[in-house]
C-alpha cells in the first residue's frame, strides 16, 4: 500500500525518483498491541515485536537519513494523498506534517480529498493525479 510505496522510495532513493503514496501513514506511528490477533501476528512477522521508531521501518527515520547524508539529489519527489474519511487519516497527517516541515529538502505535494475514504474511488482519482504530477500519460 501507500506505506510500502513511500518506504521503498525512501529506502532505495537511487531507484525511485518519484513516488505516489496514497493513504501512506507511517507504521511506526501506529500503536502496537500484542493481543494474539491475526493483525498482531502479521505485524510481528513483518516488523518484530519491538518499537520500530529509529529503524529502517520508520518513514521519518529513512527521510532523516537522506537529510543527514545530504542526499538531496537522490530525494524522491513525493506525491502523498489521503481521503478525509480514511480511517488512518491521523497517521497520514503525521507524515504530511513531517514532509511539510522538510519541504526545503523534499519536493513534496499533499492532496486530501474531501468525503472519500480508503476506497477505489479515491485511489482512481489520485492515481490519475499522480501520473500527471509525474509527467506520465493518463490513458482513459
Residue ranges of model-derived segments:
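Non-catalytic cap/lid and distal C-terminal segments of serine-dependent acyl enzymes
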Residues: 1-140
Amino acid at each position: 500500500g501507500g506505506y510500502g510505496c513511500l518506504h521503498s522510495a525512501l529506502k532505495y532513493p537511487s531507484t525511485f525518483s518519484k513516488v505516489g503514496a496514497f493513504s501512506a501513514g507511517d507504521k511506526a506511528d501506529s500503536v502496537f498491541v500484542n493481543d494474539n490477533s491475526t493483525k498482531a501476528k502479521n505485524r510481528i512477522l513483518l516488523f518484530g515485536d519491538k518499537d520500530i521508531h529509529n529503524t529502517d521501518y520508520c518513514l521519518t527515520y529513512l527521510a532523516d537519513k537522506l537529510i543527514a547524508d545530504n542526499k538531496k539529489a537522490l530525494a524522491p519527489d513525493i506525491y502523498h494523498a489521503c481521503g478525509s474519511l480514511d480511517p488512518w487519516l491521523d497517521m497520514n497527517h503525521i507524515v504530511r506534517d513531517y514532509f511539510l516541515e522538510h519541504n526545503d529538502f523534499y519536493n513534496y505535494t499533499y492532496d486530501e480529498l474531501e468525503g472519500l475514504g480508503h476506497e477505489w474511488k479515491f485511489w482512481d482519482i489520485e492515481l490519475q493525479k499522480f501520473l500527471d504530477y509525474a509527467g506520465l500519460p493518463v490513458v482513459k
